[in-house]
Amino acid sequence: MLKRRHVLSMKDFSREEIDEILETAESLEPYARGKGSDILEGKILALMFFEPSTRTRMSFETAMKRLGGKTINLGSAEASSIAKGESLADTIRVVGGYADAIVIRHPKEGSARLAAEFSPVPVLNAGDGAGHHPTQTLLDLYTIKKESHLDDLSIALVGDLKYGRTVHSLAYALSLYGADIYLVSPPTLRMPEQIIGDLSRMGTRVREVSDLREVIKEVDVLYITRIQRERFPDPVEYNRVARSYSITIRDLEGVKPELRIMHPLPRVDEISPSVDETEHAVYFRQSFYGVPVRMALLKMILED
């Protein structure tokens, strides 16, 4: 179903396709934990990261190696011919000749789709500015499936909903599962109107609030995001909203016992470390789930 296919946006996937990816990820979880595999032996994955990354870069690299493949890295833009003025299109054409697939993270929205236009091999979007982050969304859905439930879910997306690409992608995907979505943010960091409009047209129930206390006792999942400092054109505005939400043990009094707290990481001040040891915290398991999910994508796209 995904053979030789680009992974650019969650809007490109049906629920049936997502379910197949999640089922494949579950079957690969033992391999993600160390069981050997050689199904992608001889395949090469190119990692092109023009923005900082820890989890996405390392989990893709781990996923490829767990499947018996290898990776090559661009390094930084400053250390490549891009620093000499080479266009992204030309760089993609060249790298596509060295690898069987390309993972790209870039600060400009639409960059992954542009890369796909010129690439001779499949392109996987690892984040394009404030646009989309589909592989993060797939691991988020896998986490929700493992730790809670996907159907009839009540979820609060909290924090920077304007610049946070993870919540943009996740909102679209959740609409396929009939979720009730609460959007919790400062007024200046609201979810873009286009996305809210798209969700409404898809029949998704969406409610916007600024006070997390209004919804924290009602939801099954809290999806917390950091304020995206690097996206702010004005540092004064960033400082004004930087500590808008910070979850502590006290905030969890009276919540559902089965509440699960997620975060795409890295966190800054959004979740107190005291929450880490509660039954509600699943964000470190969430980070691990990136390995089997990305293994599933690579297997489905590249396996002969």
UniProtKB/Swiss-Prot annotation:
Gene Ontology BP, a term: 'de novo' UMP biosynthetic process
Enzyme class: transferase
Enzyme Commission number(s): 2.1.3.2
Keyword annotations from UniProtKB, A to Z: Pyrimidine biosynthesis, Transferase
Reaction(s) the record says it catalyses: carbamoyl phosphate + L-aspartate = N-carbamoyl-L-aspartate + phosphate + H(+)
Record pathway: Pyrimidine metabolism; UMP biosynthesis via de novo pathway; (S)-dihydroorotate from bicarbonate: step 2/3
GO MF: amino acid binding; aspartate carbamoyltransferase activity
Pfam families: OTCace, OTCace_N
Entry superkingdom: Archaea
Protein residues bound to L-aspartate: 84, 165, 226
Family: Belongs to the aspartate/ornithine carbamoyltransferase superfamily. ATCase family.
Subunit structure: Heterooligomer of catalytic and regulatory chains.
HAMAP family (alphabetical): Asp_carb_tr
Stated role: Catalyzes the condensation of carbamoyl phosphate and aspartate to form carbamoyl aspartate and inorganic phosphate, the committed step in the de novo pyrimidine nucleotide biosynthesis pathway.
Protein name per the record: Aspartate carbamoyltransferase catalytic subunit
